[in-house]
UniProtKB/Swiss-Prot annotation:
EC number from the UniProt entry: 1.7.1.13
Job description of the protein: Catalyzes the NADPH-dependent reduction of 7-cyano-7-deazaguanine (preQ0) to 7-aminomethyl-7-deazaguanine (preQ1).
Active site: C52, D59
Pfam families: QueF (PF14489)
Location in or out of the cell: Cytoplasm
GO MF term list: preQ1 synthase activity
Family: Belongs to the GTP cyclohydrolase I family. QueF type 1 subfamily.
Record's keyword annotation contains DNA repair: no
Full protein name: NADPH-dependent 7-cyano-7-deazaguanine reductase
Length: 154
């Protein structure tokens, strides 16, 4: 089993403050092992929060990120703190969702990445945002994201 080089990380194993907003939040990466093997990495954030840019009221989402690494993996503590940096940040659902995905693509240059952002209703209407970089590599096992459409109590 390959040993992961963590020497360049600044957050893992250290006390770390949450960034004031996503633009200044630091995402870190570590080398991916198993070169030549395509596999899917999934992160699920079932309690993601941000603020409505118009009212300042909290917005909530269940976010699922899947990617096939190339040379890098996102370091999970930095991802957790990056997602937390949206907590007091005002932006529309679509902007939050796509920004998260684009930052990860910029950092990792993965073979493939997708995001499913399942937002809880605002004004009685749930907004779901889906984006991916293209077709996934052939032969990877890609499970369903497992988030049911919003039904309310009906």
């Amino acid at each position: 089993m390959p040993k992961t080089d963590v020497s360049g990380l600044s957050m893992l194993g250290n006390q770390t403050e949450t960034a004031a907003n996503p633009e200044v939040a630091v995402l870190e990466k570590v080398p991916a092992g198993y070169a030549g093997t395509d596999y899917v990495v999934r992160f699920t954030a079932p309690e993601f929060t941000s603020l409505c840019p118009m009212t300042g009221q909290p917005d909530f989402a269940h976010i699922v990120i899947d990617y096939v690494p190339n040379e890098w993996l996102v370091e999970s503590k930095s991802l957790k703190l990056f997602l937390h940096s949206f907590r007091n940040h005002g932006a529309f659902h679509e902007d939050c969702s796509i920004y998260i995905a684009k930052r990860l693509v910029e950092l990792l240059e993965p073979k493939w990445l997708r995001i499913g952002a399942y937002w809880y209703p605002r004004g009685g209407i749930p907004i779901d945002v889906f984006w991916q970089t293209g077709k996934p590599p052939e032969g990877v096992w890609l499970p369903d994201q497992g988030v049911q459409p919003y039904r309310g109590r009906g």
